[in-house]
């Protein structure tokens, strides 16, 4: 059955092959996802000794930077889906890295960086900087600058 289906489909293969080639080579979404995974691996390797993921480190940083943001503000700033944000926030709260006024409440209104969270950022800083340099060196300084500009432009654009 498989061979018969393959033979039957082979007549249209050139069209689908061109389509698949176009998408796999030119799709910005595919390329950005791949870039994200590669760069994330660089950071994850450096942050591993600190028992924190890049997503968690980033979340801690943004919480500290925004000074007691609401989960909605965090989600908007990071462009992260609600379930991922909630999962990581709960983990950071359980680990004592993030403070929430009342963790027994159904809904968390505001979160803040705890003293342990500040120490975690400080202890991981040298390795974060090493990851930052490694990623920047791989991409090149010009690409890195252009990427920052592109993200800022897209972030400010209406959706």
Residue ranges and their predicted role:
Residues 6, 90-149:
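Charged, amphipathic alpha-helical coiled-coil/dimerization segments
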Residues 1-21, 126, 141-159:
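C-terminal regulatory/oligomerization modules of transcriptional regulators
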Residues 35, 39-42, 78, 120, ...:
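Alpha-helical linker/hinge and terminal dimerization helices associated
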Residues 20-23, 30-33, 37-84, 95, ...:
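N-terminal helix-turn-helix DNA-binding core of bacterial DNA-binding proteins
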Residues 27-30, 116-117:
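A ubiquitous short alpha-helical element
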């Amino acid at each position: 059955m498989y061979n018969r289906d393959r033979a039957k489909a082979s007549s249209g293969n050139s069209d689908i092959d061109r389509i698949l080639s176009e998408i796999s080579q030119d799709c910005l979404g595919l390329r950005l996802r791949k870039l994200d995974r590669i760069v994330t691996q660089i950071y994850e390797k450096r942050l591993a000794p600190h028992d924190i993921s890049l997503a968690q480190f980033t979340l801690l940083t943004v919480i500290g930077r925004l000074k007691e943001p609401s989960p909605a503000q965090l989600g908007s700033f990071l462009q992260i889906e609600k379930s991922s944000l909630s999962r990581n926030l709960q983990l950071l709260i359980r680990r004592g890295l993030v403070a929430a006024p009342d963790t027994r409440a159904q809904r968390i209104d505001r979160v803040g960086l705890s003293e342990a969270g500040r120490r975690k950022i400080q202890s991981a800083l040298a390795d974060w900087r090493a990851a930052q340099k490694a990623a920047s060196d791989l991409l090149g300084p010009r690409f890195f600058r252009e990427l920052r500009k592109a993200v800022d432009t897209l972030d400010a654009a209406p959706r």
